[in-house]
Design a protein with these regions (language model features):
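Terminal targeting signals and extreme-terminal segments of soluble enzymes
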Residues: 1-103
């Protein structure tokens, strides 16, 4: 496998499908591991939050909790709560749900 295809496969782990205005989905990809790496879920929640922001704001602060382990073979739904849209800051709360269980907030 060449470097380009490895990079492309890696980036596919972060592609979220828009389901509704504030709901996104990741369909799960078997890459040889049973459990999802926590950094992947963190990145996906940040991507979901960014997809709900119209103006150019950058992440200033990020707080999260891992509640349950995630499974690589199963889809994850990301729900975004729009807490505040201001001139300087935008606040979002994102929940990652897998099989009706909250795995990350």
């Amino acid at each position: 496998m060449n470097k380009k295809s490895v990079l492309k496969k890696s980036l596919e782990l972060f592609e979220l499908e828009k389901i509704d205005r504030d709901i996104f989905s990741w369909n799960g990809k078997n890459v040889g591991y049973k459990r999802i790496f926590g950094g992947q879920v963190m990145a996906q929640t940040l991507i979901a939050a960014y997809k709900t922001i119209d103006v150019e704001h950058f992440a200033h602060s990020y707080h999260s909790y891992f509640l349950r382990p995630g499974d690589m073979d199963k889809s994850i739904t990301f729900t975004v709560d729009r807490i505040r849209d201001g001139k300087s800051f935008t606040t979002r709360s994102v929940k990652a749900i897998q099989e009706l269980s909250l795995i990350h907030i």
